[in-house]
């Protein structure tokens, strides 16, 4: 059954799960009953400490250092008292057997940690007749299978950068079409696709236009607090948060018309999430080129306080 997000909302309305108001012609934010914010950590924060990166030996991994792996990362999250661990796809060993993913699920469960999701580096902006499009859709579907094995409810996906010769308008429609196709498979597996404000998506307007274009209850926003480029990035977050199915929090924000970044007001971001009714994971994705073992725990301690 191809259930659109709008028809799902209508069903939720009939069951008393959504506000008793008429549904407009555009996709609505998710109806939410809970308000809990759960703190998690993205494996990307330790990108220089994994032995593997995108199917190859990690060039930034220092010989002699004890390598981080996914089971070890899950246990690290447990020691920090976190609710969730986001297992970025880039850092899995190549050619993993199904047992590796189910082992991650087992280790997470016995340590009281939920695998909050995973993240892939796809590009859905290729034209329909391009072989790259077929490859990218197959790649995301494969990771939907892996997410299902791990019990992960969410995958971060990209629209992708514009391929050469493809207009911004066509690239956007290509992304919508590819997401819609992939969403049917994701729904069968019970896995959300969260489209991130990344690459060509720098504003809430474009981000939400894509989500609404897909119109699936299994496709929402993966809100990356560090990737908006606008006069007021906090306003962009406020507009996007009601549609979020996952939040990745970064310690810096981009400055419009500049290559520089500024420190993010993380407490303000958490307040935006609460004020807009977001419920779900708030995952720290630490991108600074400093030692995450030293700098990540104090940030998470503050997040746990603010999200509590």
Across the structure, where does each feature detected by a protein language model lie?
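Active-site groove signature of glycoside hydrolases
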Residues: 147-166, 189, 194-198
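Acidic-and-aromatic substrate-binding clefts and catalytic sites of carbohydrate-active enzymes
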Residues: 88-100, 124-128, 163-167, 198-204, ...
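N-terminal pre-domain/capping segments
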Residues: 2-149, 170, 177, 216, ...
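Helix C-cap/helix->beta junction micro-motif
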Residues: 110-111, 150, 188-189, 217, ...
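Acidic/histidine-rich catalytic cores of soluble enzymes
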Residues: 53, 84-85, 176-272
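Conserved active-site loop/cleft motifs that coordinate metal ions or position small ligands
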Residues: 280-287
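A structural motif
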Residues: 82, 152, 244, 278-279
């Amino acid at each position: 059954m191809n259930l659109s997000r709008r028809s799902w909302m209508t069903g939720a309305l009939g069951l008393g799960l959504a506000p008793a108001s008429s549904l407009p012609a555009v996709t609505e934010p998710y109806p939410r009953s809970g308000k809990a914010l759960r703190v998690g950590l993205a494996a990307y924060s330790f990108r220089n400490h994994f032995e593997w990166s995108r199917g190859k030996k990690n060039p930034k991994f220092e010989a002699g250092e004890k390598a981080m792996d996914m089971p070890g990362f899950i246990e690290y999250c447990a020691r920090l008292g976190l609710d969730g661990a986001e297992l970025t796809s880039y850092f899995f060993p190549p050619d993993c057997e199904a047992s590796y993913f189910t082992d991650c699920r087992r280790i997470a469960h016995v340590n009281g940690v939920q695998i909050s999701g995973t993240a892939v580096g796809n590009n859905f902006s290729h034209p329909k007749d391009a072989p790259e499009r077929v490859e990218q859709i197959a790649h995301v579907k494969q990771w939907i299978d892996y997410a299902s094995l791990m019990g992960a409810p969410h995958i971060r996906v990209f629209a992708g950068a514009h391929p050469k010769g493809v207009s911004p308008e066509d690239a956007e429609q290509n992304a919508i079409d590819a997401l819609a196709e992939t969403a049917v498979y994701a729904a069968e597996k019970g896995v959300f696709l969260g489209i991130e404000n990344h690459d060509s998506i720098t504003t809430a307007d474009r981000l939400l236009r894509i989500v609404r274009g897909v119109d699936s209850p299994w496709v929402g926003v993966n809100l990356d607090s560090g990737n908006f480029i606008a006069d007021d990035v906090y306003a962009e977050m406020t507009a996007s948060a009601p549609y979020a199915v996952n939040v990745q929090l970064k310690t810096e924000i981009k400055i419009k018309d500049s290559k520089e970044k500024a420190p993010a007001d993380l407490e303000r971001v958490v307040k935006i999430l609460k004020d807009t009714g977001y419920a779900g994971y708030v995952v720290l994705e630490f991108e600074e080129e400093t030692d995450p073992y030293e700098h990540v725990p104090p940030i998470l301690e503050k997040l746990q306080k603010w999200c509590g």
